[in-house]
């Protein structure tokens, strides 16, 4: 178990208030949303791949049953945060977030199912370890954390 109190993490910048997610095209997300595409998993990229590989079984599966990115009110690919029940925090990049994957196929979802508890996916695609630390520092006092995975 690690202590995530303010004295234990030396970070370059502190998050004072969590801001809504701003995606790469400049749009700002507010409230819970379900997206068919996420910046690194674009419709254009899918069409190009499907045109070049029309018999690819994975692409055919995704064409019949498209991936949806269900985001909570903070822009995380996670249900709304239930702060009363203990849960597992998952930090990381697009692999943890699940770009190009059904939620149930992500490593974070599988580990959470195995260990039990609420699912707090704080993954941030395209970001680094310092972003993960800032997010952990901000959310550590707001969530009932059972385990932290990175």
Segments and roles (model prediction):
Residues 87-88, 147-149:
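Structural motif
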Residues 1-89, 142:
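N-terminal secretory targeting modules
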Residues 117, 144-148:
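Loop/turn elements at helix/coil->beta-strand transitions in domains of secreted/extracellular proteins
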Residues 70-140:
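Serine-esterase "nucleophile elbow" of acetyl-processing enzymes
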